Structure formats: structure tokens, C-alpha cells
Amino acid sequence: MASIAAERIDRLHTLARAAARTGDDDRAREYVRLARRLAERNRLTLPPAFRRFTCDDCDAVLVPGRNARVRTRSGHVVVTCDCGTHARYPYTG
């Protein structure tokens, strides 16, 4: 059962990115919400790429330069959504 849910989460992530590329942000948000709910109900963790490129507050698919600002600081990357939510990710280099 979990593998079916994981496949569906991957498919919803692909659909959300495609919808965001075409400018259909509402549909992309709905796909993100469905994937998060599916992961929650099946006790699955979301893939790292999914977590990194979606906003935790407004469920938007983050596209750098369009609805997200990306800044590098010493030791971490700061991604800011249009809604104002910040996410920090460590990096080495």
C-alpha cells in the first residue's frame, strides 16, 4: 500500500511542477496539498526535492526567479517565498 502512495506522491509532484511551469499556480497548490495529505495519511516522508521546492505555508511550488528568492549566506541557502516564508538549507562549499 505504501508503494502505491509513494508512486502517487511522485506523480503529484511531477504534475505540480508542470502546472507551475505553465503558470497554473492554483492547480499546482492543489497537487501539493494532495501529496502532503497522502504522505501524512500513509505515514510517509516526502522526497527531499519535494520538500525543498514547496512552501510550507502557502503550498506553492517554488520557482526561483518567479515566485521565490534564493540567497546564499555563509553555510546555508535562504529561499524566500512570495508569501514571506523563509526556508534555510545547509550546504558546504
Curated annotation (Swiss-Prot):
Q: Which EC number(s) are documented for this chain?
A: 3.1.26.5
> How would you classify this enzyme at the top EC level?
hydrolase
Q: Which catalytic reaction applies to this protein?
A: Endonucleolytic cleavage of RNA, removing 5'-extranucleotides from tRNA precursor
**Keyword Oxidoreductase annotated:** no
Pfam families recorded: Rpr2
HAMAP family according to UniProt: RNase_P_4 (MF_00757)
Chain's role: Part of ribonuclease P, a protein complex that generates mature tRNA molecules by cleaving their 5'-ends.
**Record-given protein name:** Ribonuclease P protein component 4
Q: Which organism is it from?
A: Halobacterium salinarum (strain ATCC 700922 / JCM 11081 / NRC-1) (Halobacterium halobium)
Gene that encodes the chain: rnp4
